[in-house]
Design a protein with these regions (language model features):
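N-terminal secretory signal peptides that target proteins for export/translocation
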Residues: 1-22
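Sec/Tat signal peptide C-region and signal peptidase I cleavage site
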Residues: 40-44
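Conserved C-terminal helix/tail region of periplasmic/extracytoplasmic solute-binding proteins
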Residues: 319-358
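Bacterial N-terminal signal peptides
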Residues: 29-39
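Short, glycine-/small- and polar/acidic-enriched structural segments
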Residues: 45-198, 202-208, 219, 224-225, ...
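Secondary-structure end/capping motifs
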Residues: 248-331
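Pocket-lining segment of extracytoplasmic ligand-binding domains
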Residues: 111, 191-286
């Protein structure tokens, strides 16, 4: 009997020990699970991103795919930036959004910039997005428009009154001693080749990518006057308010580095960019067309100067000639000293991209 009691006591003690061990394991497991659910200390959390909003000249379209793919590629996040985008209807619109405080950086054209400076706005150019002039004026062959003088008395479409298409139309008109008073300017919107094809305008001011899309959509034989043959200056810059330039240089340096990263990616991986444009660009349904647009825009992103000094490098002499020309043409009234409104000190270290292969 005594041995039986002893055995029962031993069994009871073993069961208690086993149960205690099980409780310890369960408690340890619960603690581990709790640790996974509780946030890590603040030092281990992701760093806070700085918000930078870009005021665009357009809606989110294929040719700016490198600005649209942040969710997939994270170029700006990698530089500590939370990127925002405010769409516009022309470079002048982008500057208005910048000056009203809705954005930190404007994606705008030289004509709109010169006009704003002419009105006394305090602005600073910090990056040359497209060092090639991509603007043109296109007409159907039936109109017999071959040179700027032939535009007199014609109806000419522009994207908007605040766009680079209008500014560059003024440049072409000035070549023949004409002004907007000698033509009828018609606002057509971004799809400015439809009115041309339908006979609503005699010619339309556009860009290389716009002409490409027009041809894809059935545009027949046309005559093209390229503005670069008369004034070959950059098509678009990044511009900031002077106060922003003075107060946020380190942030702007990171922004430009991130943009340069994105531009380099689009140059080196146009096929990937074309596929992602389907997801992010409002006009990006056709991958093949996307690729053609992206290749054109890649070509306009590089120049002999960027071959030497990296993407974004600004040609001071060319820009001064452009500003002087706009004054000579009567588009602006004041002298603009480019060295006072253009700075290259925020550009990233040299990253040369010698060509954008087709």
């Amino acid at each position: 009997m005594k041995n039986q009691i002893t055995n029962q006591e031993d069994l009871t003690m073993k069961n208690q020990a086993t149960n205690h061990s099980k409780r310890r394991i369960a408690g340890w497991a619960a603690s581990c699970l709790l640790a996974l659910c509780v946030p890590m200390p603040s030092w281990a959390q992701a760093p806070k991103l700085d918000k930078v909003v870009v005021a665009g000249w357009s809606k989110p379209i294929t040719e700016i795919t490198n600005l649209l793919v942040e969710e997939d590629k994270g170029f700006f996040k990698a530089r500590g930036i939370d990127l925002g985008y405010v769409p516009g209807a022309g470079g002048g619109d982008a500057l208005r959004n910048l000056l009203s405080g809705q954005a930190d950086v404007a994606f705008t054209d030289p004509g709109s910039l010169f006009s704003a400076l002419d009105k006394g706005e305090k602005l600073r150019v910090i990056y040359d997005i497209y060092p090639q002039n991509v603007f043109n004026v296109v007409s159907l062959k039936s109109q017999n428009i071959f040179k700027p003088a032939d535009l007199k008395g014609k109806r000419i479409g522009v994207y908007s009154l605040a766009s680079g298409t209008r500014q560059n139309l003024q440049v072409l008109l000035s070549q023949a001693g004409l002004t907007e008073a000698d033509v009828t300017v018609v606002v057509t919107g971004l799809l400015n080749f439809a009115p041309l094809m339908q006979g609503q305008v005699d010619a339309t001011a556009a860009t290389d990518t716009g002409l490409l899309v027009g041809r894809q959509r059935g545009l027949g034989g046309v005559n093209v006057m390229e503005v670069k043959n008369h004034l070959n200056i950059s098509s678009d810059f990044f511009v900031v308010r002077e106060a922003t330039y003075q107060q946020k240089k380190e942030l702007l340096k990171r922004f430009l580095h991130a943009y340069q990263d994105s531009a380099k990616w689009m140059i080196q991986a146009p096929e990937e960019a074309a596929k992602l444009a389907v997801k992010y660009a409002i006009d990006g349904q056709n991958v093949s067309l996307n690729l053609d647009i992206i290749r054109l825009r890649n070509e306009s992103s590089v120049s002999p100067l960027t071959d030497k000094r990296g993407l974004g490098a600004l040609d001071m002499d060319s820009l001064q000639k452009g500003a002087n020309a706009y004054k000579t043409f009567g588009v602006i009234q004041r002298d603009i000293k480019i060295s006072e409104v253009v700075s290259q000190d925020l550009l990233p270290p040299v990253m040369t991209v010698k060509s954008a292969k087709r």
